[in-house]
C-alpha cells in the first residue's frame, strides 16, 4: 500500500495479532512481488493493484468491509516477533527478505534512546516525508505515533508540496533525504520563513554535503 492511513492501521493490526508485516513499494514489478511471496509465504497480501495468484489477497476497501463485521473489543495481545521484514535486491539482484528480530512497539528505554538520537519528544506535529517501505521513514513514523505525535501524511513528496504542508500545519518534526533537501532550497521564490515552525530536522538516506547542511 502507499502512504495512506489504512497502511498505518493495518500495521498495528498485524502486530496486535502477533504477525510480521512486510511493507512493499506499491510500484513493485510483478516478478519481484512473486519472488517476495515465494520467499515469505504470506498469510495475507493487501494491495490495491493486481493480486498475486495463489495467495489470499484483499484490497484496502475489501479489508475495511470485512473489518466492519468484527466486534469492537480488542483481542488479547500476542507478541509479534519478528515484527517487520524488509525487502532487498542484494548483490545477486534476486529479491531477499530480511527479518527484524525484535518485538513490535518500544520500551521506555528504547524511546529514551530514540529521543537522544533523533531529537523527538512527545506530542509533536510531524510530517512523513518518505515512503513507509523504506526503513528510516518507517521507524520515524511509528516511533512518532508511539510518542503521541500527530502524523501528517502527504500524497506525494514534491518539494513545493512539502514546504506548503510544513507552513500550513506548523510542522515541528521532519526527516528527509538529502535529494529532497536540495530540491526544496532550489525552489523558485523559496522563503526560509516558510519552515520557521520546524524545531527538529533529521536527514538520512544518503550523503549530505557540508555545503547543503550550512544552507539548511
Go through the PLM ranges and name each one:
Residues 2, 50-53, 171-215:
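Adenylate-forming
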Residues 1, 22-35, 149-169, 180:
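ATP-dependent adenylate-forming carboxylate-activation enzymes
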Residues 1-27:
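Conserved AMP-binding/adenylate-forming
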Residues 108-125, 133-173, 187:
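Conserved AMP-binding/adenylation subdomain of ANL enzymes
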Residues 14, 87-91, 126, 132, ...:
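Conserved S/T- and glycine-rich ATP-binding loop of Class I adenylate-forming
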Residues 34, 61-82, 108:
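Flexible, low-complexity linker/hinge segments
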